[in-house]
Amino acid sequence: MTILHEEINFLKKDELNINLKCLDKKERYKIWRRIPKCELHCHLDLCFSLEFFLKCVRKYNLQPDLTDDEVVDYYLFKDKGKSLNEFIERSRRVTDIFINYDIIKDIAKNAVFNKYKEGVILIEFRYSPSYIAYKYNLCIDLIHKTIVEGINEAVEKLNHKIHVGLICIGETGISEESLRKAAEFCVKNKKDFVGFDHAGHERDLKPYKEIYDYVRENGIPLTIHAGEDLTLPNLNTIYSAIEVLKAKRIGHGIRVIESEDLINLIKKNDILLEICPISNLLLNNVKSMDTHPIKKLYDSGIKVSVNTDDPGMFLTEINDEYEELYLNLNFNLEDFMKMNLWALEKSFVKSEIKDKLKKLYF
């Protein structure tokens, strides 16, 4: 039996009193894997294994003069950096590997397989058509077709033991027209997308209200990257995401902790924050994991979920996030189950899928 067909003995409600303090790291990871995880914030275009990435670099002779370690340092972001802006510039280099549609399909398939192996039962992947097409001027319609085929093939091979939703990303870093085209692309393919997002450099999106209204009016809910970048002078990105764009969820949102007014606004609107702890640490948006605001946000009554963001860039997987939160902020299994139930309830996938998973695992 391969790991792709291995049955995971997911934790039940009456197993949450396991004494984690008696377990070593390897044993804890076995427990983390058994948590029925619902992940809402993971960039598909940056979700790959190191082995796969290096294989692509070598196959297409992208950096012939660099050793494997130097390739990692040039492209990826496994060590703490300076800022979100530095990360974005580094991630642009990764578009070197999006040479053809076969690679894109392999990324999609392997991402699903890897999430399943990590114990994820529901994953919402997000991707930017313009980001993938950027380097080699690929056709975004073919990119999308390839991604959907790759996901569907993987889910089928896994006998539908993992459920996948797809979110379209629009970016404002190039031009307003680029964002508008992404919105139109999302609406045109709304049978495949469960949501729409903004990513890239964090900014106040109030000037783009018309574009986001267009997406929402076509029945597509919004999740917006906001409250991530510690270098911004104010919290306007979060206020605009909630009050102007009417986002249902916020990507990151860790700076909500800076404002009692925002905490109350988030709770009033029942908005979930898609928290990505290791990402926040590596992008220098928190000083250390033990000072990460997720614990204070959780204790304040805000709904939060645990996510990997860009696991290919960070060389991480979802269970690393749980390990860090346990070691540094004393989260326990009951906390983790509650966060995953929130993530399931706030997912954009069809209600019948959510009802089925809730009955099975929660």
Swiss-Prot record:
Residues engaged in binding Zn(2+)? 41, 43, 225, 309
Q: Which UniProt keywords apply?
A: Hydrolase, Metal-binding, Purine salvage, Zinc
Q: Where does a purine D-ribonucleoside bind?
A: 43-45, 200, 228, 252, 309
| Gene3D superfamilies on file | Metal-dependent hydrolases (3.20.20.140)
InterPro entries named in the record: A/AMP_deam_AS (IPR006650), A_deaminase_dom (IPR001365), Ado/ade_deaminase (IPR006330), Metal_Hydrolase (IPR032466)
Single GO MF annotation: adenosine deaminase activity
Per the entry, which co-factors are needed? Zn(2+)
May I have one GO cellular component term?
cytosol
Activity regulation per the record? Inhibited by coformycin but not by methylthiocoformycin (MT-coformycin).
EC? 3.5.4.4
| Transport keyword on record | no
One Pfam family named in its UniProt record = A_deaminase
Task: Give the reactions, separated by semicolons, that this protein catalyses.
Answer: adenosine + H2O + H(+) = inosine + NH4(+)
Q: Which family does it belong to?
A: Belongs to the metallo-dependent hydrolases superfamily. Adenosine and AMP deaminases family.
Q: What does this protein do?
A: Catalyzes the hydrolytic deamination of adenosine to produce inosine. Unlike other Plasmodium adenosine deaminases, does not catalyze the deamination of 5'-methylthioadenosine (MTA). Plays an essential role in the purine salvage pathway which allows the parasite to use host cell purines for the synthesis of nucleic acids.
State the name under which the record lists this protein: Adenosine deaminase
